[in-house]
């Protein structure tokens, strides 16, 4: 197994797909996806385009769907939800499909959707992702950060490092044996520096500061937790994520 970390979807190799792709958008799309599925959501379907989301979701009965839209950190007008995982309570999401489009996370998912296996990861479900990698041993693994509008994201790289760090620990292989690129080593180093203060890291991150200005303090606290959910979101068909059975 070789791990590759890419800070943004745009940095992934063109005309290639890995055996397993892991999309990361800690703040907040992949944290929300894990939360919805853990709370009993039927599935999460991701879209880059809001008009396409609306058109597809209209084919579902209103009582079986929820629409979540975020642009620039704020909720899209006319949608039931923005991109806060804390709004995704079991009472609201159980048995329903969440149709979601966000500024960054859905773009990363679209880039890797043709991979043989596509997972979503955040700090909150890191252990489930690591367990899958250790059990299945895919030959090539891309961990793709969503970034922010095409640029580097501190929190996504730290989460990639958290995954790689745990794989190294549990496999007892040296990092250089698992690392397919230098970004893996730097991501592990970043996580190692901040692993005891991930909330502090999120506060330093530019997108974390953006969310603090929007008074999303509790979202940052929630998203900074590690291994609190056992759910593994896995793509069942293009853009549709369900829990692994």
From Swiss-Prot:
One of its GO terms (molecular function) is 2-phosphosulfolactate phosphatase activity. Gene3D superfamilies: ComB-like (3.90.1560.10). It catalyses: (2R)-O-phospho-3-sulfolactate + H2O = (2R)-3-sulfolactate + phosphate. Its cofactor is Mg(2+). Its EC number is 3.1.3.71. Keywords: Hydrolase, Magnesium. It comes from the Bacteria. Belongs to the ComB family. PANTHER family: 2-PHOSPHOSULFOLACTATE PHOSPHATASE-RELATED. This is Probable 2-phosphosulfolactate phosphatase. The gene is comB.
């Amino acid at each position: 197994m070789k791990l590759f970390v890419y800070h943004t979807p745009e940095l992934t190799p063109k005309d290639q797909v890995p055996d397993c792709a892991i999309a990361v958008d800690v703040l907040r799309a992949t944290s929300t996806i894990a939360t919805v599925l853990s709370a009993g959501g039927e599935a999460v379907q991701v879209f880059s385009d809001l008009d396409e989301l609306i058109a597809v979701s209209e084919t579902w009965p209103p009582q079986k769907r929820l629409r979540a839209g975020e642009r620039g950190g704020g909720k899209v007008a006319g949608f039931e939800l923005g991109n806060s995982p804390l709004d995704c309570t079991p009472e609201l999401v159980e048995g329903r499909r969440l149709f979601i489009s966000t500024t960054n996370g859905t773009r990363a998912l679209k880039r890797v959707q043709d991979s043989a296996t596509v997972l979503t990861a955040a700090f909150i479900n890191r252990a489930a992702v690591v367990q899958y990698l250790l059990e299945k041993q895919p030959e090539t693994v891309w961990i793709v950060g969503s970034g922010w509008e095409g640029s580097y994201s501190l929190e996504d790289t730290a989460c990639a490092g958290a995954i790689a760090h745990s794989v190294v620990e549990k496999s007892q292989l040296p990092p250089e044996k698992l690392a397919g690129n230098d970004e893996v080593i730097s991501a592990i180093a970043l996580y190692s520096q901040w692993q005891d203060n991930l909330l502090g890291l999120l506060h330093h991150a530019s997108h974390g500061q953006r969310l603090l200005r929007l008074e999303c303090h509790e979202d940052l606290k929630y998203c900074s937790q590690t291994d609190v959910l056992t759910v593994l979101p896995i793509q069942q068909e293009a853009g549709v994520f369900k829990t692994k059975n």
